[in-house]
Amino acid sequence: MDLPGPIHDFLLVFLGSGLLFGSIGVVLFTNPIFSAFSLGFVLVCISLLYILSNSHFVAAAQLLIYVGAITVLIIFAVMFMNDSEYSTDLNRWTVGDGITSLICTTILFSLISTILDTSWYGVIWTTRLNQILEQDLISNSQQIGIHLSTDFFLPFELISIILLVALIGAISVARQ
């Protein structure tokens, strides 16, 4: 969006703080319904940040897929859970939980180090080369594919990692 500097900075800080408080709410709420609504708020803040950075396609996909479908599905699934089953096991910490936490922390730090060590200048050169190719393409789906693999590569990968974690969590909850 073409906003004046102070308004853009205010919206960035406002959405960032909303994202931070919403994500803290996802983790700290003991009621799963409140946690799911807080997740929906986080996903809306992320899509508004995409709009603020002129990534309208990714913002629309974020709103339609994650806020519109995934969050509603999570709330629907949480409403059918047996509440007494989860309230009695809150204070248990098993060896498997510790191993899982260690593995997830290791994966998180390896992802952070990979992102920090990646030379993003090569991605800029790839984008400039693909702009020449983009003019010759006829199909919109090919243009979307090029944009997802160049301009929106990092958000696309982060969203896919979030989906993978949600899928693994849903499978582990379903197996119990």
Curated annotation (Swiss-Prot):
Regions that span the bilayer: 10-30, 32-52, 61-81, 95-115, 152-172
Catalyzed reaction equations: a plastoquinone + NADH + (n+1) H(+)(in) = a plastoquinol + NAD(+) + n H(+)(out); a plastoquinone + NADPH + (n+1) H(+)(in) = a plastoquinol + NADP(+) + n H(+)(out)
Keyword NAD included in the entry's annotation: yes
Family annotation (InterPro entries): NAD(P)H-Q_Oxidoreduct_6, NADH_UbQ/plastoQ_OxRdtase_su6, Nuo/plastoQ_OxRdtase_6_NuoJ
GO CC terms: chloroplast thylakoid membrane
EC number(s) recorded for this UniProt protein: 7.1.1.-
GO molecular function: NADH dehydrogenase (ubiquinone) activity; quinone binding
Top class in the EC scheme: translocase
Signal sequence annotation: none
Function: NDH shuttles electrons from NAD(P)H:plastoquinone, via FMN and iron-sulfur (Fe-S) centers, to quinones in the photosynthetic chain and possibly in a chloroplast respiratory chain. The immediate electron acceptor for the enzyme in this species is believed to be plastoquinone. Couples the redox reaction to proton translocation, and thus conserves the redox energy in a proton gradient.
Quaternary structure annotation from Swiss-Prot or TrEMBL: NDH is composed of at least 16 different subunits, 5 of which are encoded in the nucleus.
Protein name: NAD(P)H-quinone oxidoreductase subunit 6, chloroplastic
